[in-house]
Amino acid sequence: TSDSDVVGSIKTSTKLSKNVITHSINSISNRLNFIKNNRSNKNLSNQNINLDFGNPIFTSMYDASSISKKLNQSPLKNKLPEGWSMWNEGTISLSKILDDSTKKDIFSNNLTIGFDKKINENEIKGFAFQVGYSDIEVGKNGTGSDSLNYNFSIYRTRPLENNNYIESLFGIGLIKNDLTRVDGSNVLSGNRNDKQLFGSVNLNKPVKKNNFTLTPSAKIDFGYTFLDSFSEEGTNALRFPSQEIETGIASLGLKFDGLSNFN
């Protein structure tokens, strides 16, 4: 295999670990936003399964189909303890990436299932499980990886003084990678595990005036991934030491909600 395939495989593995954390945080953030936008509803269960075929026409056809509607129905939502709601968020995607002259075909799917309870109008607690699978092909010779990831998160929204409130989550996870590299007539393989910690803190301060509400927010997402040392099996095998990947994103936001009457 060419050097570009080796580099591409390493870059893809690093990107995968970051994407898993991002998807986990975003899934829970989407859930909390759904609850805020549907405060008056007694039933806060919500199912959200999406397919992305890498083609907007195919994706639109799926979204309008009966298959989409069936995937977004849950038989468990009426069997939960009183006060608890169930939600899910899932994606299935197919994509092609051309980077550093190396083509990468990526098939991935992720499913998050969560349960939460509304303690009062301003306080929520819950937990979520995520499982995902990725099949990545790098180049044209058969180099690639199969990855399976699991993680568990807890999350909470609680009020603070002066009408502030905070959203927080913390999670742990594991990614199991089966790696294959083709070098001429040699096929080399190996396994590598990634252990993850991640979290997010989002501080909000709603400001109400007349029929409008402005909500400034400050958010910090962070993640840490420890990659085990890795040795291939086969001729001309490569070896990699353990590695650490740290990620962090800080952002500021402003949400506007309002109701206007037009004559």
Segment roles from a protein language model:
Residues 15-84:
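Outer-membrane beta-barrel biogenesis signature
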Residues 2-22, 26-29, 80-263:
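Membrane translocator/pore-forming domains, dominated by Gram-negative outer-membrane beta-barrels
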